[in-house]
Design a protein with these regions (language model features):
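C-terminal peripheral helix-coil segments that are non-catalytic and often amphipathic
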Residues: 1-9, 93, 106-110, 142-149, ...
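An amphipathic alpha-helix adjacent to DNA-recognition modules
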Residues: 19-27, 39-40, 51, 59-84, ...
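Short helix-capping/turn signature of helix-turn-helix
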Residues: 61, 118-124
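Key DNA-contact positions within bacterial/archaeal DNA-binding proteins
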Residues: 55
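Hydrophobic alpha-helical connector segments
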Residues: 70, 81-110, 161-165, 189
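Basic, helix-initiating cap at the start of DNA-binding domains
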Residues: 1-36, 44-49, 66
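Conserved hydrophobic residue
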Residues: 38-39, 152-154
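Amphipathic alpha-helical packing segments from all-alpha helical-bundle domains
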Residues: 77-81, 125-150, 159-163, 171, ...
Length: 214
């Protein structure tokens, strides 16, 4: 846990009512901060959006930065959970990639403010910005490395590959989903996956240049 996270460690409510109220505040923060930006969003607006008294906010979060950090962590957890559930039981890495990308785009279509929230994290709290991407990459790296061992995909640096694939997801989603406010067209998704399949395709080791043929 980073220093900034330790300073803002927040005890989660134990009652069902408390958890509902906390989630309402996080949902409101996603809407307000995603729309207005962190600097222009206010706690008053967040509580009004959530339908709770302003004082209620401070029962759950000490300040606006704290709710922002929790929002980033909540979005990260929800995204990773949805992808994990979608690919559970799948064995083929290329199929996992296809289902994983579909799930990512469905999630970002549902949480349209995710892009803006995560981009702002770099300037609000750099530690949580790095944590978001590293946490997302951790499982990805493990899965890619396992697929390389099974010779399902070509052998590359799994961390480098994970970040390349994450970059594809982010920018394709931004161009064809966030900017147009519509789901990604099937033809764009298919072309993206054709590129990924070609890049990941397993290549048996080539013979040495000096090998003699019969």
């Amino acid at each position: 846990v980073s220093d900034s996270e330790e300073k803002r460690l927040i005890k989660r409510p134990v009652t069902r009512r408390g958890r509902r109220t906390r989630q309402k505040l996080l949902d409101a923060a996603e809407a307000i901060i995603g729309e207005k930006g962190f600097d222009n969003a206010s706690i008053v607006e967040i509580t009004q959006q959530a339908g709770v008294a302003q004082g209620t906010f401070y029962i759950y979060f000490p300040d606006k930065t704290a709710v922002f950090i929790e929002l980033v962590k909540e979005l990260s957890h929800s995204l990773r959970r949805e992808i994990a559930e979608a690919v559970a039981g799948l064995e083929d890495r290329l199929e996992i990639e296809q289902v994983g990308f579909r799930t990512f785009f469905r999630f970002t279509h549902k949480h349209r403010k995710l892009y803006r929230v995560v981009r702002q994290a770099e300037f609000v709290d750099e530690d949580i910005f790095k944590w978001y991407h590293r946490r997302l990459a951790e499982g990805y790296v493990r899965g890619l490395a396992e697929a390389m061992e099974k010779e399902q995909i070509r052998r590359l640096d799994p961390e480098c590959l994970a970040y390349c694939l994450m970059g594809i997801a982010v920018f394709v989603g931004m161009r064809w989903e966030i900017w147009t406010k519509e789901p990604i067209p099937d033809e764009i998704f298919d072309q993206m996956m054709a590129f990924i399949r070609h890049g990941l395709a397993f290549c048996p080791a080539e013979p040495d240049d000096g090998a003699q043929s019969d």
